[in-house]
């Protein structure tokens, strides 16, 4: 996690990494909520 964050601190990597992380987190929450619900 620390190494990934350091690499993501670059100028051309923070946007894609951030979008992927946010999308993955949202998808996981949706998946868990949909499956549990």
From Swiss-Prot:
Regions that span the bilayer: none
Q: Which UniProt keywords are listed?
A: Capsid protein, DNA-binding, Virion
UniProt-annotated stretches for the region Disordered: 1-37
Source domain of life = Viruses
A single GO CC term for this protein reads: viral capsid
UniProt GO MF annotations:
DNA binding
Q: Which cell locations does it reside in?
A: Virion
Q: What is its main location?
A: virion
Q: What function does the entry list?
A: The J protein is associated with the DNA and is situated in an interior cleft of the F protein.
State how it assembles. Answer: The virion is composed of 60 copies each of the F, G, and J proteins, and 12 copies of the H protein.
Q: What is this protein called?
A: Small core protein
Q: Which organism's genome codes for this protein?
A: Enterobacteria phage S13 (Bacteriophage S13)
Q: What is the lineage of its organism?
A: Viruses, Monodnaviria, Sangervirae, Phixviricota, Malgrandaviricetes
């Amino acid at each position: 996690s620390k190494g990934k964050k350091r690499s993501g601190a670059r100028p051309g990597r923070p946007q894609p990494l951030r979008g992927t992380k946010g999308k993955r987190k949202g998808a996981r929450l949706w998946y868990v909520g949909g499956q549990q619900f």
